[in-house]
Amino acid sequence: MSRPQRQIVYFATAMSLVNLGDSLFYVIVPTYYTHLGLIPFQVGILLSVNRWVRLATNHLAEYGYRRYPSDLWLLGAFFTGAVVSTIYGLATTFFLFLLARIAWGIAYSFLRQAGVMHVVACSAENALTEQMGYFTGINALWRTSGLFLGGLCHDHFGFTMTFVGVGILSLLALPLNRIARKQAAMPDREARAVKESGRNGALVCFGIVMGLVGGGMIISTLGLVLKTRVGESFHLAGFLVGVATLTGFVMAVRHLIDGVGGPVLGALVDRIGWRRSTAGLFLLGSILLLMTGLQENVAGLVVVIMLYFICATALYTALYAQSGQNGPRSVAAFATAIDFGMSVGPLIGWGIAQLKLPLSTIFFTGSAVYAVGAVVAFKSLSRSSLPLSMGPR
């Protein structure tokens, strides 16, 4: 395995800082929404509206970077992310939360587009998936401690102080971004992306599946699921542990898996082949989600979810690396597919809660959707004579 490029390390760290407010929003709000004067369906809207916005702004970001190249796009996006985290802590109405989530959706389109293409610009083609694993992994490792400490701070210092503090901390992303940025032209990849722009059907399908289940239904309702199992708090080794702390711990372990597993899983995907890896991972993920819905105790549920997170990490790393290799337009298309799934996912998950259906229904539904992804992947594997835009290298 090769070492991560220095520019990738700096940029991933900056991304992790400005992403922390959004990550904590998913951890804290599902367990605290009644204190904010929100109802479950409003929570679903807030957890998904930033993704709906990105359906329009992903291609806008790609166009802006390509047509009017300037570092001001990225600086503005980082600054907006810091301001939004502060607004979370100060907002008192659903409307203010909604405006903040919309602003974050716009900013993240520019951050993600720049991040993926930054990795492509800094990586050799035969090590792209591995370097993408480093990018997502470093980002995740920096956020791991932040998520756990954020949940802990919320339980001890309150909602407002936690998010205002995160907003101030996020400003460190500005100097880190300046260190990381490096100009790199990729005319061959952009030309290839234009040539293959009409052959991304399976890529779009996989993006929707990943976004709908992992980033949408599971993550947005994890705090609620854990709360129904343990209540507001529980005792562990003589200590009183709040549900926000438990949720933050689970989310932190998820990012730890991303951090440790990203480069390793990326290297394995390169060795095994993209089609075979994708088919196997979607099938395994479907089985694990089914098992999660059948778990009766919290410990078993957490363990199986961790295994599912490993599958999701491998899929996320491989698919983003391949879309990046195809060029900026493919990145925007794949990102939009993921965002569409992530937009619908929280509405489905919290809609299930609103209808008072068993919360295990969330995992059973996710299992069925992953099974669809597996079918598409196996069909692609059997049609090797009709290669996708992201064939194995």
Model-assigned labels for residue ranges:
Residues R275-A318:
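C-terminal transmembrane helical hairpin of 12-TM major facilitator-type secondary transporters
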Residues L72-T86, G167, R276-L290:
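Structural signature of the two symmetry-related core transmembrane helices
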Residues I45-E62, F249-V264:
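Central cavity-lining transmembrane alpha-helices of secondary-active solute carriers
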Residues F110-S123, T313-G327:
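Intracellular juxtamembrane helix-capping segments at the cytosolic ends
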